[in-house]
Every structure is written in C-alpha cells, then in structure tokens.
Amino acid sequence: MPSIILPPKPTALQKPHLNLAVIGHVDNGKSTLVGRLLYETGYVDEKAFKEIEEMAKKMGKEDFAFAWILDRFKEERERGVTIEATHVGFETNKLFITIIDLPGHRDFIKNMIVGASQADAALFVISARPGEFETAIGPQGQGREHLFLIRTLGVQQIVVAVNKMDIVNYDQKRYEQIKAEVSKLLKLLGYDPSKIHFIPVSAIKGDNVKTKSSNTPWYNGPTLLEALDTFQPPPRPVDKPLRMPIQDVFTITGAGTVVVGRVETGVLKVGDRVVIVPPAKVGDVRSIETHHMKLEQAQPGDNIGVNVRGISKEDVRRGDVLGKVDNVPTVAEEIVARVVILWHPTAIGPGYAPVMHIHTATVPVQIVELVSKLDPRTGQAVEQKPQFIKQGDVAIVKIKPLKPVVAEKFSEFPALGRFALRDMGRTIAAGQIIEVKPAQVQIK
C-alpha cells in the first residue's frame, strides 16, 4: 500500500526550504488544516484518501477525513515504514515547506518545544467556534502558551488561520473580534500585528485555503497558501561548525545505525569523520538520505537520515548532537542564561529543579544561582542577586544540568542555545544561553 502522504516531487527540492511549526490549542483544527493543506497541494495519495473518506462516511464522521490523513500517516510511521517520515511537506509557489512535529501527540507541548526550536515560521490555528477561541487564548490556554513559546524560541514569522468559519456562518464580526484579541496578544509579545496575515478559513470545507471563498466576500486578503508563500526562508549558516541534534536513531537491516535529525549549522558530507556527544562516540558517514533521496552532502535546514559506521544504536539517543571531530559540540557543566518566567504558582529560588528542553534533548537541571533581575523592556539589570523570581520576571540565572547535555551560546548556535524549562506539566520559563562552562569530554 502506498504511503498516504507522498514524498517531495522533484520540483519541491529546487525550492528554498522552510520549516513550519503548526501551533494552537487542542481541537482548534490543526490536524484537519494540515491534512487539507497536504491535500490541496497534491501531497496526499488519492487512492488511500478515498479509503479514508469512505470509512469516515460509514462511521458518520465525514468531517474527520482530513485529520485522519495524519492519523494514518502516524500509524505508518510507528510501523517503521520509512526512516525520516517524522516530517511531511508540501509546496507553495515559491517554497517547499516541511511541517515539523505533527500535531496531536499527547506529549504535544514537549514535542512542540523540540519542533519550535527548529521552526523558521509558525502557523497559528485558532477556532472561531464560541467557547473554543476564548479557552485557547485564556490564561490556561495552549494557544497562548504556544505563542509565548515560539516568541521566546526566536520564531519571528507568523500567519494566523481563523478556522471553523463555517460553524459561525462566515460571520465577519466574529472574525474581526478574534483578529483584534489575537493582535493584542501578539503585540504584547513584541510582534507587529499589522504585518501578520489573519486568514478566515474552514479546514473542513476548504474556504480560503487554496482558492478565495465566495462565503467571505468581505475578506480581500491572501488565501492561506498565498500567505504561507510570503514567509522568508532564513539564511543558512553553512560556514559555521557542524551541529546536528539527533531526533531519532534506528538500526536498519543491512545498513547499520541511522541517526535522524536536522542540520542546524555547517555542512555534512559522505565520508566525514563525526563525533556524537555527550557519549563521545566517533564514526564515519556512509550515506545521507532525505525524503528517500540520497545526498552527497547536507546543509542547514535539511532533515536527514545519516548512516554512521562505527557507532551502535545503543550508544546514541535522542538529544545527543552530531558534530565533526575537529570541532566537538560543547557538553555543558553549567550555563548562564537569560530567562523569562512564563508561569509559576509561587516563586523560584536557587535549588529549583525543573526539566530543561533544549534542541531535541530533555534533561533534569537545577537553578544554582539567581544572578540578576532585568527590566523586561530595556534588558538592564534592576536588582543583583535577587532572593527569588516570579511569573512575568526576566532574569539572568546560572543553571546546572544534572545529566550530560550539549548546550551552546545562543549568539553562536541559536538552535542549541535556546530552551524551555518545564515542571508540573507546564512550561515555566523559556530562555537563551549567554555563556557555557564546558564539561570535560573524552573522545572514544
């Protein structure tokens, strides 16, 4: 049976590549909208989709067909049909867009942090349905939390899809109300809402996704695909040392160990001698593959599977980082970071021990010192060595990882220098690393 989602067409690989995080509160229609985008751009296998549609009809759940594209794909992925199938992509006129970390995992926020740290842009999906919108951007809403996260993780470009317009009868007033409230939130986060497209869509019916809808005569902006086409692919740092955080590791019969990840900086070539840290294991690159195509070399932004000789699957795990032996990624003994406290019920002092999510790694850490508290607007220190910090504060802190992890200065390697701290099932803080005290690493 063919995979439900088709691999990139030859035309796609000629286009600049952009990684897109799809964010928003649960049940606001992220999966349906992603399914619709893939379908409208010709990236869904017709035959497999017909089966899904018929099944949905039989069960009286026609509205679920587009969301089920991703469910079917996830099942294929769990059965191990392909090695780098964690990503799906589609084309606009100018770009090839990879959707990172598909929505719908229970662990979504955790995966979303990993995903957002690799994102060049974000699609924020918000439901127009009464109650759903209010919950999503309320104080406990994931929609609000996701926006805070991508802001802190450095995602500058956003498009907003106001979804489920069919449920509110394409009411312009409701659209304007949502646009105004989301704009307020975006402004608070330092975005300029006048530069952000808000598109009234229905993922289920297809309004304004690929073609202009007659149901919204009052709307004269771009369609969703046109809006996504306005994203600027970021410059790719090819001249920096190689860094590739590992997302997954497999053993493939007849091939050996394959590590999967996205090249953040530098260039990786077949034949390179590489090192994976923290385990400090050395190996040689046998082959590189992306979306079922063999590559001689991979550049920043490429999501790849790398076949490494000399390293066994047991030696490597998600969160390790691949680099070259002549410039080994930094394993951190201690870091100094600027953090913003997004949520905490009381106050945070030295000794506080949350979990850090940094690139693809998750490690327990301890805050060992509060260095200073900053004015969020100017970045100037307003208090040295505060006793505690609380929700809304911005501070410089010293953090000690309780297990080995790779961390770099944000100014040198942005994707390995930004992180989130989580505790109690919530994102407590997000931060950027200013300094790293390196740990001793013995290359094996």
UniProtKB/Swiss-Prot annotation:
For the region G3, give the residue spans.
101-104
**What catalytic activity does the UniProt entry give for this protein?**
GTP + H2O = GDP + phosphate + H(+)
This protein's GO cellular component annotations are: cytoplasm
Q: Which residues fall in a coiled-coil region?
A: none
Q: Where does GTP bind?
A: 24-31, 101-105, 163-166
* Ranges for domain tr-type G: 15-236
Region G2: which residues?
A: 80-84
Record key words, sorted:
Cytoplasm, Elongation factor, GTP-binding, Hydrolase, Magnesium, Metal-binding, Nucleotide-binding, Protein biosynthesis
| One Pfam family recorded for the sequence | GTP-eEF1A_C
**Where do the record's region annotations for G4 lie?**
163-166
Is Metal-binding there in the keyword field? yes
Principal location: cytoplasm
| Single GO molecular function | GTP binding
The subcellular location is:
Cytoplasm
Question: Record's NCBIfam families?
Answer: EF-1_alpha, PRK12317.1
The protein's job, in short, is: GTP hydrolase that promotes the GTP-dependent binding of aminoacyl-tRNA to the A-site of ribosomes during protein biosynthesis.
Which PANTHER family does the UniProt record give? TRANSLATION FACTOR
Q: What is the official name of this protein in its record?
A: Elongation factor 1-alpha
